[in-house]
Amino acid sequence: MNRTRDELAAAAIPPVKVPLWTRDYMLACCANLMMGLAFFELVPVLPLYLTGQLQVSSGWLGWIMSIYVLAAILSRPWFAHRVDSGDRKKIYVTVYILLALSFSGYAVAATALMFFATRFIQGLIWGGMTTSGPTMAVDIIPPSRRGEGLGFFGMTMTLGMCLGPVIGLQVYQQYGFYVITWSSLVLCLAGAGIASLIRAPKRPVQEPVQETPKKVLDRLVLRVGIPLAVNVMIASFSYGAVSYTHLRAHETRGNL
């Protein structure tokens, strides 16, 4: 098939690369990094504090650490619906502030049951954070660079996963557990302030529709995504083992 002169000229022009590192995208990455640092600096020291200071049994320790993830799983479907139907930025900033305030629960908790309740409440909030944050990032990233943008956005959480435990253990050894809880609170408040500066694009208001229970279930559980979800779940078991190594090393004093 012959091509016209205009088509040949248009094909010869290189495509314009849409900028990725915009002001709003960098703010979203910084806010995500703050959240990662605040969360992961507490991960390695919480078992040490519970077993060392409160003499919590291994059974209670397992429940306290795992209830966080279970609560996040429970809250994510509800937050996913709210994010799709509401103001994503408002939800993100509000949940971010709630996450910051939830760290104060560690400062006042004095029993295993209080830590369990704090972890459950914070897990519910964490489910909203990990749902609204990436969703708003998708709105900011240009569609032509979505894969690259989500890759760098996810790397900020990975960076927090790397630096957070190092910072947390150093602060715990020098200043104690309560300084970490307040530093996590401050990091989250700073992250919420950064998130509030993001100029999220306006989305059309969706009209409410009547949904049958089957449609609701199909929307919440994407059947084609189940195999990928199983793969992620299997890979997450390794993280559970890694998060326990620092406690095991502390118990054996390095004689593994």
For every predicted segment, state its role.
Residues 186-205:
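C-terminal membrane-cytosol helix-exit motif in multi-pass small-molecule transporters
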Residues 55, 87, 108-110:
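Helix-breaking motifs and short loop linkers at transmembrane-helix boundaries and internal kinks
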Residues 245-254:
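Conserved small/polar residues in nucleotide/adenosyl-binding loops
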Residues 120-155:
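Cytoplasmic helix-loop-helix junction between adjacent transmembrane helices
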